[in-house]
Amino acid sequence: MSSSLMRRVGSLAASAIIFPGIAHAASNYKLKESWEGEKILNHFHFFDNADPTNGFVTYVNQSYAESAGLVKTTDSGSLYLGVDYENVLTVDGPGRESVRIESNEYYDQGLYVVDIQHMPGSICGTWPAFWTVGPDWPTDGEIDIIEGVNKHDANKIVLHTSDTCDVGGGYKMTGDMTSSECGEASGTIGCVVQGKQGSSGDPFNEQGGGVYAMEWQEKYLKIWYFPRSSIPESLTAGTPDVSSFGTPMAHLQGSCNFKERFTHQKLILDTTFCGDWAGGVFGDSGCPVSDPSDPMLSCKNYVAENPAVYKNAYWELNSIKIYQLGGTAEVEGTQSAAAESTAAEATAAETTAAATQTANGGSIEEITTSTHSVTRTKTVSATHSTETAAVTETAAATTAAASVASEVDATNTQPVSKTKSTSYVTSTTTLCPVESSQAAATESVSRTKTTSYVTITTTLCPVESLQTANAVPSAKASTDAAAATTPAAEPHPSNAETPADSKSSADAVTAQATKTTIAVNTPNPATDSASSVPPDSIVYTAPEVTSSSSVPLFTIVSSSSQFVTVPTAAPSSFEPTDAVRDGADSYSTAASPTTPSNPVFTGVGSKVSISASVAIAAFVMLLLVN
């Protein structure tokens, strides 16, 4: 967890302690979906394929259902979903027409509330159900919230899962558990809880219908049934409080992880006839049996020959609502709470000014870039009477190079201001120190005079002082040609976050201002291919740097992406020397641009060794002074 996130969490916790009102019901269910009457169909589609449960039914599409009167809006505004109750059928022909609707979306854990004015009555041959199922059965699970067959008058709640899942934990419920194994190991039975009489069929309708509520969480699943006269006030008000719901009809919790066994459920409502369940137990339900040896055939005969009995085999829905956890309810009374969070994407306004100066035939470009950025601003405020507690956190944006300006302590844990201005001075030629272990180390260089290709990368080094830096010192040459070293301060580690989609201002500066100075001679493939280390007698030149800005100088290190601070000091003065030597043993300082594939200097070393003649070193320092 990031430090900024921990501070935000801590701030919220502190506010909750100081002002208890803002901690009010942080786990309350908040409304996610609300569909009423005919608008329910805006979120469902009609299933018109063969019945997966082998029912004696013909599911029709929406246009046909509407023209046939199987789907309509009632005078009260509720949604009617019925079946054909006019046509006599033949057993060998298509089954009775009906509708099956399925939600367009899949849903996960939450509180599901369906207000039902009427459900299919207790009629032989019927199998109505309101249920959910995942895209991969039984892996994603199935929850039968309302289900009954034939002359049902008590709802049966059934769960189906993969593998084994025992829910016989003895949890308190008003229903009776008749099977505790939900897994496919038990076949297609599933775990079953049978509700009290009056929870479905004709008795349900005689009470004016009611509300079913299902709470689906990681560790358990609870289902309540509320008759029309006993619906909890919190449900009516749209702010459900499950703690006031009382004992559920079913409390299913057991050996399996419900979070894994039930995922991505779509809602389904249908009415089929006969099928595997209703047809299989047709003779056990007190229904007329025409063929004692074949209860399924007896069911089909009854359904085909008695259309009028199915006039009451319809659903009438008032609403379907889905609530989910995660919101904070509004607090009423003398205490009030407000929480606002703003997350601004990294914004940067850059201005660049360039000036060119000429001295001793050389030129230098001074480019100053000012970057202002504000990111990840989080504000949490709470009001209690006339007192106010506010916590504001601002994280300054950083570049992709993980740069830290010298004026800001990267380890500072105090909130910073909303804006931060960082100035960069580029095109500063200097010799950055390198690690002795780096590939470009100069302590053990070859003295082969025939090696003539070397790349000197102009980089930008940070200066700790905020005052004007008129020059950047180079490595001091030793008179005995021994290695000279220039210590470098270690950079402060950066704890600031870099926005994923924000462009690095450091990259932009480097692209515009980085130059290279090359010492060239006839390349020797034999020596060049053997080592990328330059000889120790190369003349390193640097153009004059004149800065009137009170901003730090930086070195942008391409390979290590870190900033290295170079101490400020006045360079020594030397008399100018001849910059060009000719002949087989000579080097030329004629510069030409190049783009090295492997940068020579990384900017993270502790020292660098350069062996050169006194005259050459004097020439270098003279150029720096000028």
UniProtKB/Swiss-Prot annotation:
| Domain GH16 stretches | 33-286
Alphabetically sorted, this entry's keywords are:
Carbohydrate metabolism, Cell membrane, Cellulose degradation, Glycoprotein, Glycosidase, GPI-anchor, Hydrolase, Lipoprotein, Membrane, Polysaccharide degradation, Signal
Q: What is this protein called?
A: Endo-1,3(4)-beta-glucanase xgeA
Cite a GO CC annotation: side of membrane
What organism is this sequence from? Emericella nidulans (strain FGSC A4 / ATCC 38163 / CBS 112.46 / NRRL 194 / M139) (Aspergillus nidulans)
Residue spans of biased composition, Low complexity class: 477-494
Q: Which GO terms describe its molecular function?
A: endo-1,3(4)-beta-glucanase activity; licheninase activity
Q: Where is the signal peptide?
A: 1-25
Summarizing the function annotation, the protein's role is:
Mixed-linked glucanase involved in the degradation of complex natural cellulosic substrates. Active on laminarin. lichenan, soluble carboxymethyl cellulose but not on pustulan.
Q: Which Gene3D superfamilies match?
A: 2.60.120.200
Which positions are catalytic residues? 142, 147
Q: Mind listing the GO biological process terms from this record?
A: cellulose catabolic process; glucan catabolic process
- Annotated membrane-spanning segments are none
The gene from which this protein is expressed is: xgeA
Q: Kinase: is it a keyword of this entry?
A: no
Q: Where are the glycosylation sites?
A: 61
Residues with GPI-anchor amidated glycine lipidation? 603
Q: Which residues form the propeptide?
A: 604-626
Documented EC number(s): 3.2.1.6
Record flagged with keyword Cell membrane: yes
Looking up CDD domains in the UniProt record yields:
GH16_fungal_Lam16A_glucanase (cd02181)
Q: Where in the cell is it found?
A: Cell membrane
Q: Which family does it belong to?
A: Belongs to the glycosyl hydrolase 16 family.
Report residue spans for region: Disordered. Answer: 477-533
Q: How does it sit in the membrane?
A: Lipid-anchor; GPI-anchor
